Curated annotation (Swiss-Prot):
Cysteine pairs bridged by disulfides in the record: none
Entry-linked InterPro entries: ARM-like, ARM-type_fold, Mo25
The species this protein was found in: Drosophila melanogaster (Fruit fly)
One Gene Ontology term, aspect cellular component: nucleus
Gene3D superfamilies (alphabetical): Leucine-rich Repeat Variant
Protein name: Protein Mo25
SUPFAM superfamilies found in the cross-reference section: ARM repeat (SSF48371)
Family per record: Belongs to the Mo25 family.
MF terms in GO: protein serine/threonine kinase activator activity
Biological process annotations from GO: intracellular signal transduction; positive regulation of TORC1 signaling
Alphabetical list of Pfam families matching this protein: Mo25
């Protein structure tokens, strides 16, 4: 009895057939419709081989192993991603399902697909370029695959330390809301998933990240961008792994001035997120003189402002405790003794 049944192709045959169909689709000759149909059929067959189907047994481990190996040997993962814009709507979803399935595959403690992608970083860079304006129809599928990749520290490290990462500052501000939001989800995942890796990255790239790029997001004309960026900034500064970065950020007078201005924004949501960053400046027991001087100059105004700040949040115990603490700290501020 044939191992894969008469009508079912083996992993080797499936991968070969899909690669030929993708190449035909890429060539764009007169047989495009046929190539599109072949790509779709083969993607469904590979998806079913990985996930099983309603009328078939779950796939055996050795079948999945053979299929994965063929995907590596044929360089098909990169080829699929490079041609994602040419594949039909359902096919794009199947590519993401196939990619994420083989990515999660483990042999003991090893993740063979992660190891493979480490040797082919172009896969990651091509996925990141999925947020570019040229092909908006692939952005969300690219994002799904990128966030799955970001779960693995080795892959997140390649992405963070690439020039391509800094393009996210542009992607999160694109005019299409769904794409900008998806890009921000991936951006946030890369900056928060692996704490030590992220802390080292932010520390090593502090000026480029905060002064050259992040400041622009905080001053964006787009409300959603400003709010999301402000919220993420609060999370980054309050994460204990980012202590060095936080200390540096709250020592810079321009950052304090920006947060004080954002406390007075029209949007209550932005005011609230700004409060969570502002409190870090005030709570710092070792305030540099320029920071202390700004707080002292505005001492009375700040006490009055905070006393009347979001008074309707009466049931938010943590917020009210923090607000009371800040008011007390600001009231008790004194100039540094003369040297």
């Amino acid at each position: 009895m044939p191992l894969f049944g008469k009508s079912q192709k083996s992993p080797v045959e499936l991968v070969k057939s899909l690669k030929e169909a993708i190449n035909a689709l890429e060539a764009g000759d007169r047989k495009v419709e046929k190539a599109q149909e072949d790509v779709s059929k083969n993607l469904v067959s590979i998806k079913n081989m990985l996930y099983g189907s309603s009328d078939a047994e779950p796939p055996a481990d050795y079948v999945v192993a053979q299929l994965s190996q063929e995907l590596y040997n044929s360089n098909l993962l990169l080829l699929l991603i490079q041609n994602l814009h040419r594949i039909d709507f359902e096919g794009k979803k199947h590519v993401a399902l196939i990619f994420n399935n083989v990515l999660r595959r483990q042999i003991g403690t090893r993740s063979p697909t992660v190891e493979y992608i480490c040797t082919k970083p172009e896969i990651l860079f091509t996925l990141m370029a999925g947020y570019e304006d040229a092909h908006p129809e692939i952005a969300l599928n690219s994002g799904t695959m990128l966030r799955e990749c970001a779960r693995y520290e080795a892959l997140a490290k390649i992405m963070l330390h690439s020039d391509e990462f800094f393009k996210f500052f542009r992607y999160v501000e694109v005019s299409t809301f769904d794409i900008a939001s998806d890009a921000f989800s991936t951006f946030k995942e890369l900056l928060t998933r692996h704490k030590l890796l992220c802390a080292e990255f932010l520390d090593a790239n502090y000026d480029k990240f905060f002064s050259q790029h992040y400041q622009r997001l905080l001053n964006s004309e787009n409300y959603v961008t400003r709010r999301q960026s402000l919220k993420l900034l609060g999370e980054l500064l309050l994460d204990r792994h980012n202590f060095t970065v936080m200390t540096r950020y709250i020592s810079e007078p321009e950052n304090l001035k920006l947060m004080m201005n954002m406390l007075k924004e029209k949007s209550r949501n932005i005011q609230f997120e700004a409060f969570h960053v502002f409190k870090v400046f005030v709570a710092n027991p070792n305030k540099p003189k320029p920071i202390l001087d700004i707080l002292l100059r505005n001492q009375t105004k700040l006490v009055d402002f905070l006393t009347n700040f979001h008074t309707d949040r009466s049931e938010d115990e943590q917020f009210n405790d923090e607000k009371a603490y800040l008011i007390k700290q600001i009231k008790e501020l004194k100039p540094l003794p003369e040297a």
